[in-house]
Curated annotation (Swiss-Prot):
Optimum temperature is 45 degrees Celsius. Homodimer. One of its GO terms (molecular function) is aminopeptidase activity. PANTHER family: BETA-LACTAMASE-RELATED DOMAIN-CONTAINING PROTEIN, D-ALANYL-D-ALANINE-CARBOXYPEPTIDASE/ENDOPEPTIDASE AMPH. It comes from Brucella anthropi. Hydrolyzes N-terminal residues in D-amino acid-containing peptides. This is D-aminopeptidase.
């Protein structure tokens, strides 16, 4: 690493309120176990005019996952010790069951339970109880890929871990975290507060400077996948604990942050609640977190004993800020990609028959395309006539076929262009046997709308948009968790007579949920 330059970090931080507009936030940089930069700005609550401080607690959301895995390693031991308990937990399973290690590494193939809550009729601002979480997870019978073969983000993995840990130890996760993680690390005010409705020390905001900022409503109860609330000072203490134990081969963070592989031996991007990343040739470990009204991110570079943290009480770019702080501290500069103009033959929708996933491409100008495939849009650089890349995805076009590669997910898809005109004979009621949930499709004035119904309630009506013959998109931009699943892909099946018999409903988080038609 080049000479550490705090002035460049300070200059970047001074402009955060201007470049990332929102109510407030905090950032920090820790080097060699010492705080070299910490800053708070804005307000924890706009109405009460409560300032944001270094000691203001905020939900750290999915950053909690590494702490759940830390408890597993510290209070239980190796993940394999809970494999029998997981088999009993997933007692309705028909496919190959994942192992507990697969849960820790997001290789289980289980569909994300927050995404599935949408299919079960959940109200985005509704109450979600622990019993409902278990009911949803325990009804699962299948995975959307063979465990250990790919990466797919799944909050339910860590919710199940929490349940298994509590059952094994006979203690609450609240108590174990406090005793075995927070106290040794000096995280004085960190606490697992499972009920998001009970946290009122800081307000998270939806919106932006165009629509305005409004307090976000959250009423879910979660544990394992999220739920910890902590201040910047608490998170600094965690980074200092990591640094202080760096030379201990049995140290907790060293065990959490080791390299992981898929079952075929290929390096994996995630392990024990940590993203395993690289920048400027340096290995990073960390995680982001999101809930309606909140965003946060931490990164750690063990080789340089360097950590960055960003926490916002609005839906801004905390992940981008923490990553930029890391790059500035490491002296890594960004390079401009050489681009060519996108040929119109790229544009449109492309379907992978096996997964039911759809890639939608549109021109974004200046040699870029906007791609919709995962939970949020990606900007792709068109690097040649038949190849485009984003940070996580590479696509190559050969006539009417696109090869999509996400190397970090061990995923390679062959996608065909979606053609033809959509028929409107899809209206009716469809049933998922696995979820015991329905999808209702209706036509109003020639427009098609869909609604989900299940044990969590009945959803609003959502408009459907056709992209070709028997392939429709159903956008859902608000859900109990954040970010939302995005576009649900609906791929219909017909019999030999051309009659609709059912469909596959899926998104990146929850692929290929099968429905059969029960009522035209």
């Amino acid at each position: 690493m080049s000479k550490f330059d705090t002035s460049a970090l300070e200059a970047f931080v001074r402009h955060i309120p201007q470049n990332y507009k929102g109510p407030g936030g905090v950032v920090a940089v820790v080097k060699d176990g010492e705080v070299v930069l910490q800053h708070a700005w804005g307000f924890a609550d706009l109405r009460t005019r409560t300032p944001m401080t270094l000691d203001t607690r905020m939900p750290i959301c999915s950053v909690s996952k590494q702490f759940t895995c830390a408890v597993l390693l510290d209070a239980v031991g190796e993940p394999e010790l809970l494999d029998d308990a997981l088999e009993a937990y997933l007692d309705k399973f028909e496919d190959e069951r994942p192992a507990v290690r697969d849960l820790c590494n997001n290789q289980s193939g289980l569909r994300d339970y927050w995404a599935l809550s949408v299919l079960c009729g959940a109200d985005p601002e509704g109450v979600f109880l622990p019993a409902q979480a278990q009911s949803l997870l325990r009804r699962l019978k299948t995975t959307h890929f063979e465990p250990g073969s790919h990466y797919s983000y799944c909050n339910g993995n860590f919710r199940i871990l929490a349940d298994l840990i509590e059952a094994h130890t006979g203690r609450t996760l609240v108590d174990i975290l406090s005793e075995r993680i927070f106290a040794p690390a000096g995280m004085k005010r960190a606490e697992l507060i499972s009920d998001t409705a009970l946290f009122d020390e800081c307000t998270g905001y939806e919106g932006d400077t165009v629509r305005g900022f409004l307090p976000a409503t959250n009423r879910i109860q979660w544990m394992g996948d999220a739920g910890i609330c902590a201040s910047l000072n608490d998170m600094i203490a965690w980074e200092q604990f990591i640094d202080a134990t760096r030379d201990d081969e049995s140290g907790l963070y060293r065990r959490l942050s080791g390299p992981q592989t898929f079952k075929d031996g290929v390096a994996a991007p995630y392990g024990f609640g940590l993203n395993l990343h690289e920048t400027g040739g340096k290995r990073l470990t960390g995680h982001g977190g999101a809930l309606r009204g909140w965003r946060c991110q931490r990164w750690h570079c063990a080789d340089e004993r360097l950590s960055t943290i960003a926490m916002f009480n609005f839906e801004g770019g905390a992940s981008e800020v923490a990553f930029k702080l890391m790059n500035i501290a490491l002296g890594v500069s960004s390079s401009e990609v050489s681009r060519v103009e996108a040929d119109s033959a790229w544009f449109g929708s492309w379907l992978d028959d096996e997964t039911g996933l759809v890639l939608s491409l549109e021109d974004a100008g200046h040699g870029r395309m906007k791609a919709r495939f995962g939970t949020s849009p990606e900007m792709m650089d068109v690097v040649s006539a038949n190849e485009a890349r984003s940070a996580v995805t590479t696509i190559r076009r050969d006539g009417e076929t696109i090869e999509l590669v996400r190397a970090s997910e061990n995923l390679r898809l062959s996608m065909k262009r979606v053609k033809g005109e959509a028929k409107h004979d899809i209206i009716g009621r469809y049933h998922s046997d696995e979820l015991d949930a329905d999808l209702l499709l209706v036509s109003e004035g020639g427009a098609i709308y869909g609604a989900f119904e299940g044990f969590l309630g009945k959803s609003d009506m959502y408009p459907l948009y056709s992209v070709g013959s028997d392939v429709w998109l159903l956008p859902v931009q608000r859900s109990m968790d954040a970010p939302s699943p995005g576009e649900w892909k609906l791929v219909f099946r017909r019999d030999d007579k051309g009659e609709i018999t059912g469909l596959s409903v899926g998104c990146w988080l929850a692929r290929g949920v099968e429905y059969r038609r029960v009522q035209p």
